[in-house]
């Protein structure tokens, strides 16, 4: 049996994707529509107060293409807090006009593939804590995709030795480091939580960097032999004070 990688786990993560039902929203009188939007704004501004206490974070993005219109990403210390947010969101009047298109449940994760030996408690390391319990950058653009490590008769990631996986992940990581300062990456583990094994969330002020890093990674052995991917979602940052314009219908 191959040795399993150990993980450090941080905040729980919930990506919620919605399409706006514009046809139904269009027939709502303007004053009622404005009230829906105001209630939605207040809800998100209230949930965002966790930032000041460093007990979570969240981000809102306008997704490009027909897979979704909005992405709401929430990070919280407990899974049940994510349930509470989703339940309270579903009670909002605006929820009647937002059609769920996709969701992803996971937890911020760091593996020990590239970790050196140390006697210190990693959860007390400031650098590690900042990665497990992050302050999201709220860059202009976001890219999210789920992924698996391939396991079939020809290529099975989980049958490789720890040393083989460490070498592959080191080479993989070297490519990622080339994009430091251009892309901020968050890996969330989802084995037992969702249909894929990991979620990858990228932030950048230059949307083209997503294409560049994903393409370059295709030539890396870790990805070429062992990577399997779900749908990609790309979008632009939207703040709650922009909701009036976003939901406006002339």
Curated annotation (Swiss-Prot):
| The protein's enzyme class | oxidoreductase
Extract the coiled-coil ranges from the record.
none
Q: Which Gene3D superfamilies does the entry link to? A: Apc35880, domain 1
Give the co-factor note: Fe-coproporphyrin III acts both as a substrate and a redox cofactor.
Signal peptide positions (record): none
Q: In which pathway does it act?
A: Porphyrin-containing compound metabolism; protoheme biosynthesis
Locate the active site. Answer: 145
Job of this protein: Involved in coproporphyrin-dependent heme b biosynthesis. Catalyzes the decarboxylation of Fe-coproporphyrin III (coproheme) to heme b (protoheme IX), the last step of the pathway. The reaction occurs in a stepwise manner with a three-propionate intermediate.
PANTHER family in UniProt: COPROHEME DECARBOXYLASE, HEME-DEPENDENT PEROXIDASE YWFI-RELATED
The record's listing under HAMAP family reads: Coproheme_decarbox_1
What protein does this entry describe? Answer: Coproheme decarboxylase
**What gene makes this protein?**
chdC
